[in-house]
Amino acid sequence: MVVIYIMSNKQGLIILISGPSGVGKGTIVSRLLSDNNLKLNVSISATTRKKRASEVEGVHYFFKTKEEFEQMIANNQLLEYANYVNNYYGTPLSLVKEILDKNENLILEIEYQGVIQVLRKGFRTLSIFVLPPSEDELVARLKKRGTENDEVIKHRLEQAVKEYAHRELYDHTIINDDLEKTIEDIKQLILKYNQ
């Protein structure tokens, strides 16, 4: 069942940022969040993953059992969700509505499967697909991280090809060859969509 929410003009915008691993999504989102003029918020995700010692319930995640999470799915209580490495992750709809009802914006760093789910809900959205300047540059960025071996990098590149095939889902595509320009371009899009 698809549930569509009718939003008024006074409600905020959901900004969806996607792109291959290593393109700079996390840095972009972090920098955008520091600009108070954009009225951006992040939502705390729900997950079935085990809580780590340093994590706090309701601060880092809402920790759920598999049964609780599946009940949230059945009750349409999630904006989007995915199963990753045998654990569910999702964005609680109640928090999304709370943010948007305050005429503030929600920003999500999200894969294309999640974008499809969000678009089906009927909220006002701005979706942006971020690309690297080239495949060689993407490989260089992934290697520079120093956290992935060649096999993982190969897998991430295969995933990037799959993600790129879905770029038509997005309102805008931006090539991140200059971080400052990319951030400024996205800021201008957010301001334009919020007029």
Swiss-Prot record:
Name of the protein this chain belongs to: Guanylate kinase
Annotated ranges, domain Guanylate kinase-like: 12-191
Localization annotation: Cytoplasm
Species, as recorded: Mycoplasmoides gallisepticum (strain R(low / passage 15 / clone 2)) (Mycoplasma gallisepticum)
PANTHER family: GUANYLATE KINASE, GUANYLATE KINASE-RELATED
Enzyme Commission identifier(s): 2.7.4.8
Keyword Transferase: yes
Family classification: Belongs to the guanylate kinase family.
Free-text function comment from the UniProt entry: Essential for recycling GMP and indirectly, cGMP.
Taxon lineage: Bacteria, Bacillati, Mycoplasmatota, Mycoplasmoidales, Mycoplasmoidaceae
CDD domains referenced in this protein's UniProt entry, alphabetically: GMPK (cd00071)
